[in-house]
Amino acid sequence: EQLTNEGVKIFGTSSASIDLAENREEFARIIKKLKIQIPEYCIAKNYEEIINFSEIAQFPVLVRPSYVLGGRAMQIVYNKEQLVDYVFRSAEATNDHPILIDQFIENAFEFDVDALCDGEEVFIAGIMQHIEEAGVHSGDSSCVLPPYDMSNKVKKDIIDMTTKLAIELNVVG
């Protein structure tokens, strides 16, 4: 954003579009607008919001502070007591940023999509499937191409979601 403000031309996706994708609340709004199904989640800004979500949440949930890299301070918790314990232990890592809580889907498959977009058309180069079960941090996992266990419906859904998101976010690259 700072480079853009200084008049430096950046090729590819604009800093505004990147910020839109990185901002959890804005991204959630886009997901809802595009009618893309995702697990229940909460972007908790305070302890009260965490407790309120824990009353209605289906455990296990994946909790993590926003604005951290590499899976640091992420954890799967299985009940309200573990969630409260996590909040108190991770207070330093959160640095007054929201805590993200997502319903964790056990025995799920995780996929990565490589796609190119020119702002109008989307080309899916490949869909990779993680070898490990879906978990806390995908950055240290291994993938295979082509996927070893993906139905035609799941493939179609992934392509549809990727296309909708790339166009909505004005992805270029």
Language model features: what each stretch is:
Residues 8, 12-74:
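A conserved helix-loop-beta module that forms one wall/lid of the active-site cleft
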Residues 56-173:
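Internal nucleotide-binding/catalytic subdomain
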Residues 1-4:
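N-terminal glycine-rich "phosphate-gripper" loop used for MgATP/nucleotide binding
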